[in-house]
Amino acid sequence: MVEFSHTKKIGSAGRFGSRYGRKIRVRLRDVEIKQKKEYKCPVCAFPKLKRVGTSIWVCDKCGAKIAGGAYTPETGAGKVVTKAIRRVIESKSREI
């Protein structure tokens, strides 16, 4: 017997069938795609950073544990802060 899947458009959120409404299932699909995507480790640059729990990410190669966002290793706010810190460090190195 062949299993039939109703997940062509909605992806993994198809497991909920017609429950909860389309918008919520689409949002869930987008979050799950981000969450399961392969990310690079900031320590060793190996592309196998995996989510262990909420905001906890572990590299398969070097074993580095990183605290990040709930669904992605680096949040939008974290990127902004990192850029600001880099600018400050660069401006101080230019002064010297």
UniProtKB/Swiss-Prot annotation:
BP GO terms, sorted: translation
Pfam family, one: Ribosomal_L37ae
Single GO MF descriptor: large ribosomal subunit rRNA binding
Cofactor binding note: Binds 1 zinc ion per subunit.
Domain of life per record: Archaea
Keywords, in A-Z order: Metal-binding, Ribonucleoprotein, Ribosomal protein, RNA-binding, Zinc, Zinc-finger
ZnF start-end (C4-type): 41-62
InterPro entries in the cross-refs: Ribosomal_eL37/eL43, Ribosomal_eL43, Ribosomal_protein_eL43, Ribosomal_zn-bd
A single cellular component GO annotation: ribonucleoprotein complex
Cofactor (UniProt): Zn(2+)
Family named by the database record: Belongs to the eukaryotic ribosomal protein eL43 family.
Protein's UniProt name: Large ribosomal subunit protein eL43
Organism: Methanococcus maripaludis (strain C7 / ATCC BAA-1331)
Taxonomic lineage: Archaea, Methanobacteriati, Methanobacteriota, Methanomada group, Methanococci
